[in-house]
Amino acid sequence: MLSSYSSFPERSKGRLFLEKEDPQRDCYQRDRDRLIHSSAFRRLMYKTQVFSHCGDDHYRTRLTHSLEVAQIARSIARLLGLNEDLTETIALAHDIGHPPFAHIGEEALQEVAAEHYRFEHNAQVLRILGEFEHQYMDFDGLNLTWETIEGLAKHNGPIQEPHQIIEEYNGLLDLELNKQPSLEAQIVSLADDIAYSSHDIDDGLLSGVITYQDLRHLPIIGENILKFEKTFPEASKSQVMYKARRRMIRFLIYDVVDVARENIKRYLLKTVDDIRELGFPAANFSEKVGKEMKEIKAFLYNNLYFYYSIRKSRVKLKRIVKELFEVFFHDPQCLPKDYYERFRIADSMNKKAQLVCDFIANLTDSSAIREHRQFFSTCVLERDY
């Protein structure tokens, strides 16, 4: 049963293009189904989380990360009586705007296109799902509901300086950018933090970049490791680690739920409008846990994301993205025909740079590497002619 402050499908603010209702599925269920069957969602399978999937099939990708975020977010939504379908849709789609190599690729596009365009993956997701999916005859894109679009644009909170893509959607739909997002969107942001803080640790261990001993000194997960080592002295390190991560995720989920319930009770939040009008997020980590999460994130940044071998990869991968941009921007006839035609008639350097970013953002890790080889490999292959 949905709580009064959840997002009710029958009260949705609708879609940009009017459609008939489905007699069997509500509007948020249709959003989720459209997303899952989209090519943009499938491409997440071949985009980096921390370690490139090209190097090892066992590392998480943007797809597996998004599935884990969705599972955690649905668990929180269920405990709070929120709309699980809307929550799941926002969670599954939240990383679709990432270019190849994820944050590394985003940094590269931001640097190389800076003179003409500001690339931002949180905004790019709206462009990809709103323009670059072509399954429907009556409109471009997936024609998602207002609540899904609002959640994707604002799941990290109100926006003071919106990206031009978000400004365009705001002009069409009035996304109330100065207000808090729905509680469904808020918990996706927290579920994202929970997922990568716990699962990036797992990939770090798998890679050997971080060690079991490193984790024993961290808050939350380290406390659980020490506890389970004493409770299960015969267990292997991998068994202790798996149980400690499970307990960490559960602990963080309950912390978010407790804070949200306390805020709902204290501030008499009865409707989704009350959630949006509140001057701060109704869902969050408690103060103590928030500090501990920052400590875990700092550990991951210092010991995993910027580890020397990963830093070496960052240099190479950023170079791939930057050089692809330079080729396509200065020689647009190298773009696929449909992109080239749009580039040719674009009336500003901003729009031209945006189109090149669009093309690159739709590439997977492996397709970006293949494109780069076609231009920069020293090997001349017969099939290139």
From Swiss-Prot:
The keyword Repeat does not apply. PROSITE patterns: HD (PS51831). Residues 62-197 form the HD domain. Pfam families: HD, HD_assoc. It comes from the Bacteria. Keywords: Hydrolase. GO terms for molecular function: dGTPase activity. InterPro entries: dGTPase, dGTPase-like, dNTPase_2, HD/PDEase_dom, HD_domain, HDIG_dom, PHydrolase_assoc_dom. Disulfide bonds: none annotated. GO terms for biological process: dGTP catabolic process. Belongs to the dGTPase family. Type 2 subfamily. PANTHER family: DEOXYGUANOSINETRIPHOSPHATE TRIPHOSPHOHYDROLASE-LIKE PROTEIN, DEOXYNUCLEOSIDE TRIPHOSPHATE TRIPHOSPHOHYDROLASE. This is Deoxyguanosinetriphosphate triphosphohydrolase-like protein. It comes from Neorickettsia sennetsu (strain ATCC VR-367 / Miyayama) (Ehrlichia sennetsu).
